[in-house]
């Protein structure tokens, strides 16, 4: 009962839109915000919160961070090891016996990692990195007059201050990137909206850097759109985003339903608000930002003339001549002379209908942290502040937020729950410890989580809202988000089969539900044999000529990925081993065609390019696993041998591997300047061992590095960022340093049980 009371208090504390009259005044609504701010510390917010009062609430895989201002609630809801770990607080764990073998290191790692398992059975983590995610949430809050609790505002300020570039004070596209106009414009705006004064030294420094880069007129398309929504910029600076495209017949080769899921879900709310030229209520803060963000007087800016103005460091993917021509025609001919209101009204109505279907399919969570806040603003503009959809969106926006030792950030989605849990299970399996009773309670909880998170039905009217079949699938995060992904289905399915075929574990997911997952997986193969992520490609790479984002590459359509292809191949192979009579010919054909594509995707240097992890090391690990699944290894396969030789050529003197995120951008292997990384080292070792690479001494050197990096309490420390999307933006997978590292150690221990390494 006490825990329920504490949880209720915490739940109330994490709903900024529902702040009671007794709570603090909203920091970003009225024109007298600055007057309110001066009554508090400099900047209108506190210096810091009390980290002993933060709790991460896990409700069936839904994460919300709670700040307990009530002392009774504080006593009733103690911090867990996971809370303290996420917040960077001391864990005061005892030192474990020093590992004398790789298997000892796995056990020590599991001793630590088990303490981070959450009540619903999964492992949480921050999924940060991109520096444009938090602005999406905060700018949407401000535009919709959503109260921002002081503890959110305080830790937002702390996080952005911590992540400012140490030399120029700006912000980049992601946490390890160079300062950009995109990152600096949006994050400077966030700080002003949460109450930081313009004359704060850090703001003065950031503003000077922004002005040196040309000011906000030199920002990319997405930033200009957000500034127009706030009323900080005029809508004329935004290139056309016509919702009429949603009215095109499906047969049109560039119709939006053919675009990659993330870009079409961003284009949807963008087009709705662009069409309406809606802007938030003007405040003193908005008027001040008009002076702070631009190098010219606001009234003298040629807004239309700056539609295509962009700083070179933001212009990762320059707009094509074709898109520039289309934009010119839409802005100068179609919009002023031929755009008729009945058609625009119809387009806006259909766009809103698609947003409403997204709400229904995700319970107002939406696909991710960019489209969700954008949809919130659309719903607010459409129906006002009191509709259920607006209130529910505001509640669920909290699930995108995360608190770490630096402050409050926004995750790339609402989490990595199913993905990380699947890898955690496989880690124990690869070490040969699934039958060890010591780890059975942990594994059973993980299995129960995957049981709970399997998606049991397809989306309502899935063809109407352009969704892929998903019955029997798993999402990247949780079933509320509900977007099936080929590799997420595959890794979760493998983990379920592994445990349910292990003596002592119950069969929670029956055969029919397993078959449902297989039926859905079999819909993911592309004509060339490969697999993509959310759905098979619906248009070709030529669509990148319409890429308006400027800061991203490979964003307009789905692409083929060796990582996703491998995951599906290995899942189908494992399934076929246990259910040989279910759709055997289709599965065999799928696997053969997929592995054949893997071979064609190999690069001249022997590696594979990774799109979801950094970079060649990541993809080569998966590709070698694909080849091994059909019996092709270093000894008998030219492709496997070339892949291994590529990895070995990158091994460092200390035995590790060290790939920098620049490899994703340049397409060439780039060494990380800080030296070997445990995650990259683990990926390389896993790939080599999957391929039966024969030189044990090379493997031992890498394993030795992993063991030496392990801390006395069993953990590994965070190193460089691990993940990537759209070639140019990096994203964090902090649990990889546990799951893949223990997997590599466990595989070595099983392969060479008598080799103690140290």
Residue ranges of predicted features:
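Preference for long, amphipathic alpha-helical scaffolds in soluble/luminal domains
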Residues: 1-758
């Amino acid at each position: 009962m006490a825990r329920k009371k504490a949880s209720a208090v915490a739940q109330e504390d994490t709903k900024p839109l529902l702040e009671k009259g007794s709570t603090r005044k909203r920091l970003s609504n009225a024109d007298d915000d600055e007057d309110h701010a001066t009554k508090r510390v400099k900047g209108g917010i506190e210096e810091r919160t009390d980290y002993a009062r933060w709790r991460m609430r896990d409700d069936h895989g839904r994460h919300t961070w709670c700040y307990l201002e009530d002392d009774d609630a504080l006593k009733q809801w103690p911090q867990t090891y996971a809370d303290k770990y996420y917040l960077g607080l001391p864990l005061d764990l005892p030192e474990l016996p020093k590992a004398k073998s790789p298997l000892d290191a796995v056990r020590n790692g599991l001793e630590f990692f088990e303490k981070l398992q959450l009540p619903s059975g999964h492992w949480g983590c921050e999924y940060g990195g991109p520096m444009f995610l938090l602005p999406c949430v905060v700018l949407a809050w401000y535009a919709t007059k959503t109260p921002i609790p002081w503890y959110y505002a305080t830790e937002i300020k702390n996080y952005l201050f911590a992540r400012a570039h140490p030399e120029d004070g700006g912000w980049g596209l992601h946490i390890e990137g160079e300062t950009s106009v995109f990152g600096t414009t949006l994050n400077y705006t966030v700080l002003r909206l949460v109450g930081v004064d313009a004359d704060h030294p850090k703001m003065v420094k950031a503003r000077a850097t922004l002005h040196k880069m040309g000011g906000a007129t030199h920002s990319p398309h997405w930033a200009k759109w957000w500034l127009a929504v706030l009323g900080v910029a005029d809508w004329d600076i935004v290139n056309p985003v016509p919702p009429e495209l949603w009215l095109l017949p499906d047969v049109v080769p560039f119709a939006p339903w053919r675009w990659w899921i993330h870009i079409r879900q961003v284009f949807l709310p963008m087009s709705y608000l662009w069409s309406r030229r809606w802007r938030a209520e003007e405040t003193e803060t908005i008027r001040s930002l008009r002076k702070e963000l631009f190098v010219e007087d606001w009234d003298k800016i040629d807004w239309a003339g700056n539609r295509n103005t962009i700083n070179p460091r933001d212009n990762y993917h320059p707009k094509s001549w074709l898109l520039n021509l289309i934009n010119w025609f839409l802005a100068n001919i179609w919009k002023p002379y031929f755009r008729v209101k009945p058609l625009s009204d119809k387009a806006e109505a259909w766009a809103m209908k698609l947003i409403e279907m997204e709400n229904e399919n995700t319970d107002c969570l939406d696909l991710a942290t960019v489209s969700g806040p954008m949809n919130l603003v659309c719903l607010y503009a459409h129906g006002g502040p009191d509709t259920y959809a607006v209130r529910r969106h505001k509640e669920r926006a909290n699930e995108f937020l995360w608190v770490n030792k630096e402050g409050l950030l926004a995750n790339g989605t609402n989490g990595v729950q199913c993905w990380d849990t699947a890898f955690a299970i496989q880690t124990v399996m690869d070490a040969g410890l699934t039958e060890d009773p010591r780890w059975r309670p942990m594994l059973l909880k993980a299995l129960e989580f995957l049981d709970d998170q399997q998606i049991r039905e397809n989306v309502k009217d899935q063809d109407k809202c352009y969704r892929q079949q998903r019955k029997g699938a798993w999402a990247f995060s949780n079933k509320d988000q509900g977007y099936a992904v080929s590799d997420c289905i595959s890794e979760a399915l493998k983990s379920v089969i592994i445990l349910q075929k292990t003596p002592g574990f119950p069969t929670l997911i029956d055969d029919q539900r397993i078959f449902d997952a297989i039926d859905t997986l079999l819909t993911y193969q592309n004509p060339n044999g490969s697999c993509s992520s959310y759905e098979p490609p619906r248009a070709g790479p030529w669509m990148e000529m319409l890429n308006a984002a400027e800061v991203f590459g490979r964003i307009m359509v789905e692409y083929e990925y060796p990582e996703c292809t491998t995951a599906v191949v290995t899942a189908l192979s494992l399934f076929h081993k246990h259910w040989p009579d279910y759709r055997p010919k289709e599965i065999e054909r799928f696997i053969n065609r997929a592995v054949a594509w893997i071979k064609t995707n190999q690069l001249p240097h022997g590696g594979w390019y990774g799109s979801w992890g950094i970079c060649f090391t990541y993809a080569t690990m998966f590709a070698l696993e694909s080849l091994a699944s059909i019996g092709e290894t270093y000894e008998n396969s030219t492709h496997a041998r070339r892949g291994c030789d590529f990895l070995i050529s990158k091994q460092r003197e200390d035995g590790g591997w060290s790939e920098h995120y620049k490899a994703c951008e340049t397409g060439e292997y780039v060494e990380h300047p800080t030296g070997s990384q445990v995650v990259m080292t683990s990926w390389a070792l896993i790939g080599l061992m999957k391929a039966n690479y024969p030189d044990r001494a090379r493997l031992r050197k890498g394993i030795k590095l992993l063991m030496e990096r392990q801390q006395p309490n069993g953990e590994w420390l965070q190193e460089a960022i691990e993940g990537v999307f759209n070639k140019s933006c990096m994203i964090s997978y902090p649990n990889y340093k546990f799951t893949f590292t223990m997997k590599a150690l466990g595989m070595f221990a099983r392969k060479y049980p008598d080799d103690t390494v140290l």
